[in-house]
Amino acid sequence: MIRQSLMKTVWANSSRFSLQSKSGLVKYAKNRSFHAARNLLEDKKVILQKVAPTTGVVAKQSFFKRTGKFTLKALLYSALAGTAYVSYSLYREANPSTQVPQSDTFPNGSKRKTLVILGSGWGSVSLLKNLDTTLYNVVVVSPRNYFLFTPLLPSTPVGTIELKSIVEPVRTIARRSHGEVHYYEAEAYDVDPENKTIKVKSSAKNNDYDLDLKYDYLVVGVGAQPNTFGTPGVYEYSSFLKEISDAQEIRLKIMSSIEKAASLSPKDPERARLLSFVVVGGGPTGVEFAAELRDYVDQDLRKWMPELSKEIKVTLVEALPNILNMFDKYLVDYAQDLFKEEKIDLRLKTMVKKVDATTITAKTGDGDIENIPYGVLVWATGNAPREVSKNLMTKLEEQDSRRGLLIDNKLQLLGAKGSIFAIGDCTFHPGLFPTAQVAHQEGEYLAQYFKKAYKIDQLNWKMTHAKDDSEVARLKNQIVKTQSQIEDFKYNHKGALAYIGSDKAIADLAVGEAKYRLAGSFTFLFWKSAYLAMCLSFRNRVLVAMDWAKVYFLGRDSSI
């Protein structure tokens, strides 16, 4: 019985041994005593040394080791996939496909209408990107030959973002469309709604020309100019923050003031004036620039000029009782409390009455007159119509507002009989604010509008060539049905974002019926992610991300 038990034990473990070692153990068990065989089986050294090398048995890995290997592989594959996606996206943007050329007629003989777009801002570019440009002869007229990503413009004067990272050439945008687009680097200065013509003047250097352009449809998206509210001295002594040239000018003034102040004695009152930076306007542009300026002083200038950086004063002047009035009160209070912590001097209920070369004269909420000395003054408040918009207003009776071009619910210019549309900051309509988000959605809406307008034009052409009354009736029904599908423009507010300094941001979000209020460092990451996603091209996203990484590791570039 004992020997049989031993044999069963040997055979039960025989899978662990090779054939030779198996037969050897059986023979050994038959010829030796039970105790000797048992001792052999219990001798771990013999089993490990003589049997293990021939078995191929692998020890089971721990859960954490297996998980670690899987995670490492997943990260590696993700990095490879991400690199491939980035490379492909950049290649696709740099190598556009062949475009359909412009022509006077379509293959069926119907007329191809001309659509002229004035401007290269948010509304105009949104229309151009979403429009099927094969349906019209599309012409873009703008004195600025690039699109500017304005939400990140306040980051550029102090070097957080480089200007080249937030611009995209108009010709590049136009070249990526399916149909050919003509572009004129020129400024429209007169529109004739009666004869449907536009007078433009070249803004290109060494290439002056005047040109008359005919249109069937005209979209005015020329934006707005800064509104000084008639305050004396603003145009002469302050800097605005709407264009690349404005950011470059502010950067030059900041660096010049700092260098001049460094050459003066700390007790000199002129030094204190030069180191006083004043921002007028408590909207997103003014708030974000003040925050960026404070960050530059605290995070960069303090390293290289520690004593001087302590003397720099940032002041934000706002005529209303609060800054960022489009945000929820909780977020407004959060931003104002943070500004106090950052030592940004908030002057609320303070209205600027006059500006001279060194001082702002302002009226406080108590009615007192206060003089605020400054070294650099940035005016970031209010919009006013441009000259071409003012000119157009005088030619249409219905245009009786000074705040902007009046439009209906389909973005058609009042009094223009359906041939002129207006979008963006150059317009005025109750409930629509002069923001990039509004202009972007207006551009998307018009792209769909013109798609349906093309369909109606084609149905009308077919109706004029119909052979019998039944076909005419059928086409009329289709026209009525298509016209009924053109809905009014409805703005979908998705929320508002603002950077408030010290790597913190606020977000007032609307998702369906729900509303969310976010504030803090996590919101700053969301702010970055949202603006990266909103960048016009993949190239812009890469450059902006690299700028942020550069600031994190190397600091801001303060050179001019």
UniProtKB/Swiss-Prot annotation:
It catalyses: a quinone + NADH + H(+) = a quinol + NAD(+); a ubiquinone + NADH + H(+) = a ubiquinol + NAD(+). One of its GO terms (molecular function) is NADH dehydrogenase activity. The keyword Flavoprotein applies. NAD(+) binds at residues 275-311. FAD binds at residues 114-144. Its EC number is 1.6.5.9. Its main location: mitochondrion. Present with 4930 molecules/cell in log phase SD medium. This is External NADH-ubiquinone oxidoreductase 1, mitochondrial. It comes from Saccharomyces cerevisiae (strain ATCC 204508 / S288c). The lineage of its organism: Eukaryota, Fungi, Dikarya, Ascomycota, Saccharomycotina.
